From Swiss-Prot:
It catalyses: an acyl phosphate + H2O = a carboxylate + phosphate + H(+). The active site is at R23, N41. InterPro entries: Acylphosphatase, Acylphosphatase-like_dom, Acylphosphatase-like_dom_sf, Acylphosphatase_CS. Belongs to the acylphosphatase family. Keywords: Hydrolase. It comes from the Bacteria. The lineage of its organism: Bacteria, Pseudomonadati, Pseudomonadota, Gammaproteobacteria, Oceanospirillales. The gene is acyP. The keyword Hydrolase applies. Signal peptide: none annotated. Pfam families: Acylphosphatase. Residues 8-94 form the Acylphosphatase-like domain. This is Acylphosphatase. It is an enzyme of class 3 (hydrolase).
Length: 94
């Protein structure tokens, strides 16, 4: 796989996304898609997601972030391309 076939993004997810199993569900979906990175709660109530993997898989994860698990109410997902960072080794819940 060529490097240009990979995508590295950071996403910030707003809404009712803490205390609803959002991070663990994100990890489960990411692992199924073979996407590396992390999901962590932020003090302002959002969840930050770092994702690295095949472009199609990362795009599928981004699509899923807009819905999240059943108990979540996602109001916004902002994404930004990441450049110059070492890709993560697995997917962690922080």
């Amino acid at each position: 796989m060529k490097v240009q076939d990979k995508q590295h993004i950071r996403a910030w997810v707003s809404g009712k996304v803490q205390g609803v199993w959002y991070r663990n569900s994100t990890r489960q979906v990411a692992e199924r898609l073979h996407v590396l990175g992390y999901a962590k709660n932020l003090p302002d109530g959002r969840v930050e997601v770092l994702a690295y993997g095949d472009t199609e898989a990362v795009n599928q994860l981004i699509d899923w972030l807009h819905d999240g698990p059943e108990a979540a109410i996602v109001t916004e997902v902002k994404t930004k391309q990441v450049e110059g960072e070492t890709p993560p080794l697995g997917f962690e819940v922080c």
